Amino acid sequence: MPLWVFFFVILTLSNSSHCSPPPPLTLRMRRYADAIFTNSYRKVLGQLSARKLLQDIMSRQQGESNQERGARARLGRQVDSMWAEQKQMELESILVALLQKHSRNSQG
């Protein structure tokens, strides 16, 4: 027998004795089903995380726009108040001028 055949037979016999037999079909099917479930579960968790992230971003943007609207409303009230005060001061100065003119006319 050639030497290489002898080594081949020895390697074949030694490899088959150390290898465990393949798991039964039911165990492989169970593992396959577990892998499918795990992958699907990861996808669902990823989708939920993405959805929550989008909702957080949208609520932050909405909160910022509400703050901007509130700031604009406050600014509008301040401008209205300043405008009203300015008009009141102008009216007071007109009334004072009219009263002074009237008092000069009545004295003179």
Swiss-Prot record:
Signal peptide bounds: 1-20
- What PANTHER family does the record tag this protein with? GLUCAGON-FAMILY NEUROPEPTIDE (PTHR11213), SOMATOLIBERIN (PTHR11213:SF6)
Role noted for this protein: GRF is released by the hypothalamus and acts on the adenohypophyse to stimulate the secretion of growth hormone.
Q: Which GO terms describe its biological process?
A: adenohypophysis development; adenylate cyclase-activating G protein-coupled receptor signaling pathway; cell-cell signaling; growth hormone secretion; multicellular organism growth; positive regulation of cell population proliferation; positive regulation of circadian sleep/wake cycle, REM sleep; positive regulation of growth hormone secretion
This entry's Gene Ontology molecular function terms read: growth hormone-releasing hormone activity; growth hormone-releasing hormone receptor binding; neuropeptide hormone activity; peptide hormone receptor binding
Q: What's a single GO CC term here?
A: extracellular space
Question: Under what name is this protein listed?
Answer: Somatoliberin
**Which residues does the record annotate as propeptide?**
21-31, 78-108
Q: Which family does it belong to?
A: Belongs to the glucagon family.
**Record has Signal as a keyword:** yes
Q: What is the lineage of its organism?
A: Eukaryota, Metazoa, Chordata, Craniata, Vertebrata
